[in-house]
């Protein structure tokens, strides 16, 4: 196995013109406003153009998608110049989720803006039927984007021939096996022709990478890339609080706008998602919900409109992190995640042994007890994932309302912010063991592992700063939080979940039919409508924050309320008198005379 020379830093001198790319491809790159190649692009593109197999590890948001698409398109365009009439499926791009497949498709559309007549591609990871996809595949597009499960189905049916395949990409490779694609990947590896150039792209290195590498790669270059400039702009905070105080802090952070910009909130359960949504609604804070129950068309449309800036808050469930934990327990191994791997560190196998030794025995036992319960819970769309690989644009803050169950999931979550050199903030709520289970309505089983996950993050030298609040000022808001939380009952959460699912199913059908014919009206479609579920204890005054509760720095400087006339408006009085005439309250006049 060939290995590159340790950490690769970004070279500010390199430009895309240094790669001698096709002019059409360079124009598309310029149109995408890519000023210069990122670290992973600077290292990957030259090696890929030489025909090398690559295993590239870089932080999320570092441009890994373009890092493999650009060299593949360049080599395909050169091939087309030699023989323009050659037909076949030359590139297969495998991704773990449907959302990521659509994202790759969108990037591919932009990069082929000036060569779309010569490069044809298709995304078969959608929820369209096989009868629709079959003729499109029989037309032999140059590039196919798919999840492993969809790919295996089409290969078995004979409509996806791989005999002419030249490029294989496994994006988010560290997640492929944890998503349950073990057998699918083994089946596909037996169908690959010899000499296929393989790309394994990942945000972390794990045992899964080593097993996939043996299946599809031949003497790959292993690139562990760190972009100091990008990673330095991510600020990570941790807040230790009780389960109930999570809701209090979320209310304060969002209502007082202590976090400015778009926010992505992660929770660990679908019911938790709707509980938080209903809670925030009572304070006039609208939010979107993303989970595996929603139709894929609705999920993609929500993501698209969030990226356009139409919405500010998304509450997403990260059930894939729970699935990854189950597989770790069943295989009796623990994932190894490293943001940077240098040449003077131990080998991959030694690091795995060290990581296994660090696992908290108590957390393993607790997770094993809940294994069957978790398996029942993960019955939704297997190919759903929002924490992994998706490009949420301009996210100012990632809020881990519920701490992820492993460090690998944490790295993927916080990677949704501070992308492409922009600053970002990640904040995590950690529940101490002494506080777990004290407030049953807001209690969550996964909170038992919060402290063990935090210790493992600290061992990996991930910089987590404490975020301090003034306790006296926080307690002043507590009664408002308790009033709102008391109204969000289990029955209300279940009703909201059912109502939203029904609404989104209807919207999904409209997206497929009506809005296909009326694209202009698509903008009027909203996903953040206030829940129709009536909460018995909802109080209007919660939407307004009294000035006496605000910190001194946030109180209004100008307290002049303007001109108040001395003369009263008597119209209201006249209206009341007409509406409730005095004779109705006069017992003598209200009596009816008997004939």
Curated annotation (Swiss-Prot):
Residues 233-485 form the Helicase C-terminal domain. Disulfide bonds: none annotated. It comes from the Eukaryota. It catalyses: ATP + H2O = ADP + phosphate + H(+). A motif (Q motif) lies at residues 14-42. GO terms for biological process: rRNA processing. The gene is dbp9. Residues 574-595 are annotated as: Disordered. This is ATP-dependent RNA helicase dbp9. One of its GO terms (molecular function) is ATP hydrolysis activity. Keywords: ATP-binding, Helicase, Hydrolase, Nucleotide-binding, Nucleus, Ribosome biogenesis, RNA-binding, rRNA processing. It is found in: Nucleus, Nucleolus. Pfam families: DEAD (PF00270), Helicase_C (PF00271).
